[in-house]
């Protein structure tokens, strides 16, 4: 990854693992400067801490220095808690001292929404680039090395003894050191680091995630992001996380923003910005969740669970109602609770002796807290169809001990606990937390978490062998065609030119002829074979059907002549005259295929995106589509096809033959390579409909429209 350097890693390492800390703006008052100093001083036995403030000789019992340059050593990190107007001066002093890392708590930059604030932040960013002093912030709450109890943070909350393997990165400092930290403490979820990135004038969310990929103490990365400073960089980080098998779990806000924009094609109208992010995160293995609790619970589950050996879920509970509700929630989200095999069923029935019954989910009634409970868990765990064990109970001390022992006995099997008792601290619940048993408090959240665990490892197993597709080289013929059409920037190309373009990338198109008079139209129809379709080949009018510019099912010469005259008239009424009308296209009718849409759009943040969905004129009504970033491989293409509800028609429906799904997948791959190779110059592309013919007969593009941009 070209954006990642040794200096960058070293600077972040100094922020998170400092041996010396300077707090500029340190104060005896417990405002930001005072809290930051107090937090740092908790590690003063291991870390040299230097208050810097010319107004004091001593702060909080520690000698205070007038400036960074007056310090007895070069600090690993300088914490800046001064007015926004003073920040650049402090950064310059720090650079003169040789410091390579700064955490800027100060606010008053771009978050103010003023030009003055934006300009000041731009100056901070420029200083970081030119000096090599890397900056977290401004307008952040700092960072914390939780596992080593070193807090470079202006938060009033600490968390002694909370060290663990979940690395937390948040753009919002108030969220990082507020609800996330509070919930982690309450739930006993151990963290390795807490990082707030603030306005990201220099280092951004992706930089810190990238650092955590190299950190052996961090098994899972949890994040809260409002928007990516560089979305493509995050995608590269996500790819690297997949290669290393380190999960990223993310809250990405903005689900309610539909990203509506003026667009000429169906594809752009169907592709909201959040839908793009959702597709991209899924494509690269990032687990997207909705809220604080879900983020931490899923992160805790993945950090304390091996990959399930099977997809089946075994549920054991002391309550028939709870076990049934849990099974219902699991079933709704697509999890499987297999029937017990003979050995498990007979073994459990032997233990229960008529009090309850052997099933999955298993209601063990009065035996839930007995000495027999470990045997029941073990019988279920030994069933090879079971990959994950769930215990649902209000649990006492003895049962918590038994569950912990079961986890230690079968370390290769994920185990989760659905706690049904009071969430007030009890000995049993406390034991489970301290033993790092993943605990959930509602059946739906448990089901969602286990779904994420299974899906992630399934996805990882596939990507671990196939990797990610690369953009292939564009050939000379393709480049020439694209270069010629790029001069039409912003204009919706005619169908004839759009089809000619996609044909260069191996997309099959209908047989057709562009004519200028009725006699030639009749001759072309005779050569193609009746029935035929006829269309006015116009520019800048992508939805031809709405303007009466498409005639279908023409069966003879008389119908062709009549259609020619009508299309010319309708084109004139639509304003398509002169250079706006290339002619009338006579085309073969494809009548035995399934209509689908294949499209491309380009997003300035994420790049080229391919869309697949149910096709035809009603595509925007049904919005039955799947998205991926380009390029894709064939397995991605097959996943996209499976994601679309209307794709059932491709499998054969009510006596219709199965369609050529293999050829469709190949076409999706070709179009994705085209979009990736053109890298933004192709703004939009619709192939709608693409006709998927019966198995073995391929596909044909019956219509297409492309839009280029400079």
Model-identified regions with their sequence ranges:
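Catalytic-core regions of core metabolic enzymes
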Residues: 1-710
């Amino acid at each position: 990854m070209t954006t990642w350097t040794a200096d960058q890693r070293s600077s972040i390492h100094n922020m998170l693992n400092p041996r010396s800390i300077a707090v500029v703006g340190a104060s005896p008052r417990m405002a930001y400067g005072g809290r930051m100093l107090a937090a740092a001083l908790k590690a003063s036995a291991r870390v040299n801490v230097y208050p810097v403030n010319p107004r004091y000789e001593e702060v909080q019992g520690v000698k205070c220095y007038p400036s960074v340059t007056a310090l007895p050593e070069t600090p690993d990190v300088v914490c800046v808690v001064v007015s926004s107007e003073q920040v650049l001066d402090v950064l310059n002093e720090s650079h003169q001292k040789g410091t390579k890392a700064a955490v800027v708590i100060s606010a008053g930059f771009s978050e103010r929404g003023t030009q003055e604030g934006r300009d000041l932040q731009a100056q901070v960013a420029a200083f970081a680039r030119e000096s090599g002093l890397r900056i977290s912030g401004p307008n952040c709450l700092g960072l914390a090395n939780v596992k080593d109890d070193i807090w470079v943070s202006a938060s009033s909350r600490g968390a002694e003894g909370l060290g663990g393997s979940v690395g937390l990165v948040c753009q919002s400092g108030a969220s990082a050191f507020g609800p996330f930290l509070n919930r982690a403490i309450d739930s006993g979820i151990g963290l390795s680091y807490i990082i707030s990135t603030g306005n990201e004038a220099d280092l951004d969310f992706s930089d810190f995630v990238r650092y955590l990929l190299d950190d052996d103490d961090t098994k899972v990365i949890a994040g809260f992001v409002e928007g990516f400073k560089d979305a493509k960089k995050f995608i590269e980080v996500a790819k690297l996380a997949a290669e290393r098998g380190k999960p990223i779990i993310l809250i990405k806000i903005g689900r309610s923003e539909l990203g509506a924009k003026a667009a000429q094609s169906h594809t752009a109208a169907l592709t909201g910005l959040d839908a793009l992010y959702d597709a991209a995160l899924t494509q690269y293995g990032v687990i997207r969740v909705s809220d604080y609790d879900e983020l931490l619970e899923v992160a805790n589950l993945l950090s304390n669970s091996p990959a399930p050996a099977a997809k089946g879920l075994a549920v054991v509970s002391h309550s028939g109602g709870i076990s049934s509700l849990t099974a219902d929630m699991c079933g709704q989200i697509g999890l499987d609770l297999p029937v017990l095999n003979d050995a498990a069923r007979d073994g459990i029935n032997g233990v229960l002796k008529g009090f309850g019954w052997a099933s999955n989910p298993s209601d063990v009634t009065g035996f839930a807290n007995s000495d027999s409970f470990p045997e029941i868990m073990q019988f279920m765990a030994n069933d090879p169809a079971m990959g994950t064990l769930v215990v649902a109970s209000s649990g006492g001390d003895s049962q918590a001990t038994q569950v912990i022992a079961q986890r230690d006995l079968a370390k290769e099997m994920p185990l989760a606990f659905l706690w049904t008792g009071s969430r007030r601290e009890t000995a049993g619940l406390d034991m489970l937390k301290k033993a790092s048993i993943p605990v959930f408090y509602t059946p739906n959240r448990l089901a969602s978490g286990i779904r994420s665990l299974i899906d992630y490892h399934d996805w990882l197993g596939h990507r671990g062998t196939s990797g990610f597709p690369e953009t292939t080289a564009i050939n000379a013929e393709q480049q020439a065609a694209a270069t010629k059409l790029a001069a039409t920037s912003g204009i919706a190309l005619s169908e004839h030119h759009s089809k000619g373009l996609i044909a260069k990338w191996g997309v099959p198109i209908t047989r057709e002829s562009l004519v200028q008079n009725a006699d030639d139209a009749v001759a072309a129809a005779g050569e193609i074979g009746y029935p035929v379709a006829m269309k006015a080949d116009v520019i800048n009018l992508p939805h031809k059907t709405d303007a009466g510019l498409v005639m279908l099912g023409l069966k003879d010469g008389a119908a062709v002549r009549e259609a020619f005259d009508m299309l010319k008239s309708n084109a004139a009424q639509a304003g398509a005259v002169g250079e706006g009308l290339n002619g009338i296209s006579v085309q073969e009718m494809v009548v035995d295929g399934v209509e689908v849409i294949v499209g491309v759009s380009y997003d300035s943040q994420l790049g080229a995106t391919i869309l697949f969905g149910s096709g035809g004129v009603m595509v925007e009504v049904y919005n039955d589509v799947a998205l991926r970033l380009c390029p894709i491989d064939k397995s991605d293409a097959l996943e996209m096809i499976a994601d679309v509800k209307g794709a059932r028609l491709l499998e054969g429906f009510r006596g219709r033959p199965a369609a050529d799904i293999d050829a469709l997948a190949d076409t999706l791959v070709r179009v994705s390579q085209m979009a990736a190779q053109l890298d933004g110059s192709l703004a939009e592309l619709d192939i709608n409909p693409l006709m998927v013919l019966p198995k073995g007969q391929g596909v044909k593009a019956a219509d297409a429209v492309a839009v280029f941009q400079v």
